[in-house]
Amino acid sequence: MKKMKLAAIFAGLVSVFTFSSCLNDGDSGPNYDLYEIVTVEDGSIFGGPVLKGDAWGYTYTPVASSVLAGLKASDGSYYKRVQVGIKLMEGEAITEGKKSYKVSEVGLIAILNYKDFNVQAATLKNEYALVSLEDSNNKIWAINGYVNVPFTFKTKEQLNMNDFHLYAVEAKEDTLVTRLQQTKGADDAYQTGGALISFHMPFNDMEFRDIFDQVVPKSDTIVVKVTAKGENDKELVSTVKCSASNMQGSY
């Protein structure tokens, strides 16, 4: 079977603070059928966890819980956002129009940075200028409840995810306006770094929900607009269209 590659939007996922977990050195791993960035969705009383893919909208169901053993953190919970190699169950094949597949092997390639939207934006005291909201490899995308934001920043010290916050600002017709804010840094910072963070929409938070519910979808499509403070008083803006029902489906 011809291998399917990640869509171009997912190329070059390199972050100065991505926690990577790769295959053993010198071992190319199983002969995977495809590679995906996925969201790990917890199971219900009717079944175990499944993987929801970003690139093609596929759902991957493991044939046994042990298939996802490599996606567990030390506390036994599953990482929510990961890049993986996937081996389809024998007899399965990628078919046009088919969106659900059973998988026999899943290999962890990288753990993505992920966190919730900030719902206490009023407490964020500092805001430092970002270099850009996109890079040559990635633009923002939104799927399965996550807004995925690649960005470039400047710093004089080591930073982590907790130094960057995305929060909802307002609804404008079919658009949810958000802001990405860097709260740790220095005005004379000179080192440049790049990162990708998957921000989860907190639909269980009433303040966020009130803003989101004011967005008016057009045939289920909404726009997520990410803004940020840029250098030299420039306002950075990046937008993406996504499915309103898909974004709410996993909360």
Regions found by a protein language model. Give the residues of each.
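Beta-strand/loop nucleic-acid-binding surfaces
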Residues: 55-75
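Short, solvent-exposed, Trp/other aromatic-anchored flexible loops in extracytoplasmic proteins
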Residues: 75-78, 186-229
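Beta-strand elements of well-folded, non-transmembrane domains
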Residues: 90, 153-157, 184, 205, ...
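Surface-exposed beta-loop interaction hotspot
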Residues: 92-154
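Short helix-loop boundary/capping segments
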Residues: 131-194
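Short beta-strand elements
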Residues: 230-251
